[in-house]
């Protein structure tokens, strides 16, 4: 239960419980939330004085509701205001200084799925704040458990700019 505040971007208000229905999920939401948390905790100086986190999961098969739930929880865990904007949307909404390629008071977190075959999911994850301020998890893999869910992931390579 709960309400949606009449503001933009919308935020859940007075949420008392989130229910996951059995056998209707492959654990991708929990997996991606853990990826975001690990990326947040990597190179912490990148977001040390920020107010916002924007979560871009548009290149995953997650629903809009799932993406919003992940962003909301991620914002809660990181004590930042959550958004679900892409890089372009952040520019369009005036969050980014387009000329300087800088988000002064936030970081963009993006996960891009590359492949999902034979019980192995591959993806990249990035944390971006500026043209020369970014961290990347490349060629990450997650294997499906016997129950069909993804739980743990391995980082293929780490890069920073």
Give, region by region, the residue ranges found by the protein language model:
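Short beta-strand edge/turn micro-motifs at domain boundaries
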Residues: 2-5, 137-161
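Flexible low-complexity loop/turn motifs enriched in small/helix-breaking residues
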Residues: 1-134, 158-161
